[in-house]
C-alpha cells in the first residue's frame, strides 16, 4: 500500500505517539485515494498505491511523486495536492490540471 520512501519515513516515527503514526498512515492513504479519484479510475491496475508517494517541499507543502506503471499511465497534467489532518481525520484533495503544451491527447 505504501511506497518504500513512505515506509522509511514512517519507520523514523518509531518513538512518536501512536496518534502521530496513525495520522501519518491515514494521510498517505488519503492522498492515494484522492489521486485515484482525480484520475477517475479508483485504486486499480492503472493506479497502484505503492507507486504514489507523498513528499514535502522544504516549506512543508506536500506534493505527489509517481513511479512505475502509475507514472507510465498518468495523463500529462499538473498535480495539485492539498492535505490536512487532525485527529481522527485525514483529508486530501487532488486536482489534475491539464497540460496544454499541445503534446497531450486531451485526456486526463
Identify what each model region corresponds to:
Residues 1-108:
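Core catalytic alpha/beta fold that binds nucleotide/phospho-ligands
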Amino acid at each position: 500500500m505504501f511506497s518504500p520512501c513512505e515506509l522509511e519515513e514512517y519507520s523514523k516515527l518509531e518513538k512518536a505517539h501512536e496518534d502521530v503514526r496513525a495520522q501519518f498512515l491515514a494521510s498517505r492513504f488519503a492522498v492515494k485515494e484522492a489521486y485515484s479519484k482525480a484520475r477517475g479510475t479508483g485504486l486499480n491496475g492503472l493506479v497502484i498505491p505503492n507507486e504514489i508517494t507523498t513528499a514535502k517541499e522544504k516549506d512543508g507543502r506536500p506534493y505527489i511523486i509517481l513511479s512505475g506503471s502509475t507514472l507510465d499511465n498518468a495523463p500529462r497534467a499538473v498535480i495539485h495536492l492539498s492535505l490536512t489532518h487532525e485527529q481522527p481525520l485525514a483529508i486530501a484533495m487532488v486536482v489534475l490540471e491539464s497540460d496544454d503544451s499541445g503534446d497531450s491527447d486531451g485526456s486526463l
